[in-house]
């Protein structure tokens, strides 16, 4: 289980941690899962503006205001609970020879727009095969 600080970042790159986890395995599937109702996991390009573009797009799609029936927590918190409908809580990546088979520009990231929860858990699991 990874413990991730999201207090200052909305997108956190998990790729290095996933690569390190996969080195203990050979061939199979690595699943990256966030057991939270207001966060997700994505495979995107980072460092070229795509991560900021994703956050900007999600903020436009899910504005923090009083339109939501789910109204506990901070103002607009209902939007946070809709995030996993757009960014799933898990991704599965094929692994060969202990290496995740990601494309050149692909990174595995935690997406968390909910500033009420500054710590997240991320579960890594592996299915041999």
UniProtKB/Swiss-Prot annotation:
Gene3D superfamilies: YjbQ-like (2.60.120.460). It holds the Pfam family UPF0047. InterPro entries: UPF0047_YjbQ-like, YjbQ-like_sf. It comes from the Bacteria. Belongs to the UPF0047 family. This is UPF0047 protein Mb2586c. It comes from Mycobacterium bovis (strain ATCC BAA-935 / AF2122/97).
